[in-house]
Amino acid sequence: MNLIGSYQHHHHHMMPDPFIFSPGSRCHQERPYFQGWVLNPGEVSPEFPAQPPYSPEYGAVVGPSQTSGRIENLGGKLGRRKGAPPKKERRRTESINSAFAELRECIPNVPADTKLSKIKTLRLATSYIGYLMDVLAKDSEPGGTEAFKAEIKKVDGKRRREPQPTEGYWGAAPAGEKKLKGRTGWPQQVWALELNP
């Protein structure tokens, strides 16, 4: 909002305003003194047009008690937050966030100070489910299984955007890795990218 706008200084020791010395400038000016000082007409909505502080019908100056209603109405319009979500949307967001917090607690071996995004939480949960499926599949085999590891490493943005070779997803297992029984592909690949050091 332009507070300086068309505010005119009437100090004689400063630069003179040509309007002060014009022949038609007696008691009343053509424009109200404070018009544009508080509100610029271009910044006010059409619901609240800028009106002069005097009533041309009666020739009387309008007092503050008569204009305060207009200012309060304008303040109410400008004071309201734009885009404030409704209660239903806030409750939905809180519900989703609490569900993600509960899901994060279910993933083992994640340090307490680690912040996980929603997508990382979903990927880790998917990988953990895959791990549990492998444990169930290997349960009948002698020898036991490894414990679940949730060591999180940071992956730089460039590596994340690079397309992954399809050979690692569906084809032969990379050298040094054994091919897992049952569910293979995406969850194990995500687990390898997100967690393994």
From Swiss-Prot:
User: What upregulates it?
Assistant: By bone morphogenetic proteins BMP-2 and BMP-4.
Q: Which InterPro entries match?
A: bHLH_dom, E-box_TF_Regulators, HLH_DNA-bd_sf
Q: Which GO terms describe its biological process?
A: heart development; regulation of transcription by RNA polymerase II
Report where it is expressed, by tissue. Highly expressed in the adult heart and expressed at lower levels in the intestine and gall bladder.
Q: Which GO terms describe its cellular component?
A: nucleolus
Pfam entry (one): HLH
Specify the superkingdom: Eukaryota
Region feature Disordered, mapped onto this chain: 61-94, 155-184
- Basic residues bias: where? 78-90
The answer on whether this UniProt entry bears the keyword Transcription regulation reads yes
Output the PANTHER family linked to this UniProt entry.
Answer: BASIC HELIX-LOOP-HELIX TRANSCRIPTION FACTOR, TWIST (PTHR23349), HEART- AND NEURAL CREST DERIVATIVES-EXPRESSED PROTEIN 1 (PTHR23349:SF3)
Q: What does this protein do?
A: Plays an essential role in cardiac morphogenesis.
Q: Describe, as the record does, how this protein assembles with itself and its partners.
A: Efficient DNA binding requires dimerization with another bHLH protein.
- What this protein is called in its record is Heart- and neural crest derivatives-expressed protein 1
Origin organism is: Xenopus laevis
